């Protein structure tokens, strides 16, 4: 599971394509360790201050000295959607929700899901179970909702 949180932002001066050393929270924000948690994965953006280089991906937060963010999977970047070889200078590193991962309600109030849905509990009060990869619902439970 990927963790996300509002107002998580730090800076880094790390160069290259490896794990990023985090330099502390920007004013008014919290650190990745505080906002996401040690060992958790999150969506991130690294953006070069005053430049065009950027990377959006999935990474893992580590509580260390200094705290780090590993760059596990790149979703998009200024380097043809590959790891960016960041040059010297300060970069902003922040938690984000990539557009490609967002679930959006369209103008007709529909939500289209392109893959699997994991439900724990009920949907509109109906218990749902899966068996052999097929969605099944108790017939008597459905009949009870008709009256």
Task: Describe the function of each predicted region.
Residues 20-22, 28, 63, 118, ...:
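Intrinsically disordered, low-complexity, compositionally biased regions/tails
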């Amino acid at each position: 599971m990927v963790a996300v949180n509002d107002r998580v932002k730090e800076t880094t001066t790390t160069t290259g394509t490896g794990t990023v050393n985090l330099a502390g929270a920007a004013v008014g924000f919290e650190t990745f360790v505080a906002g996401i948690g040690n060992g958790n994965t999150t969506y991130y953006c690294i953006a070069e201050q005053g430049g065009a280089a950027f990377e959006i991906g999935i990474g893992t937060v580590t509580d260390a000295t200094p705290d780090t963010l590993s760059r596990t999977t790149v979703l998009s970047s200024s380097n043809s959607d590959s790891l960016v070889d960041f040059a010297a200078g300060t970069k902003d590193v922040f938690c984000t929700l990539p557009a490609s991962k967002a679930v959006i309600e369209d103008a007709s109030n529909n939500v289209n899901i392109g893959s699997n849905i994991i439900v724990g509990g009920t949907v509109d009060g109906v218990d749902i179970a899966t068996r052999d990869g097929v969605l099944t619902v108790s017939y008597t439970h459905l009949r009870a909702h008709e009256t």
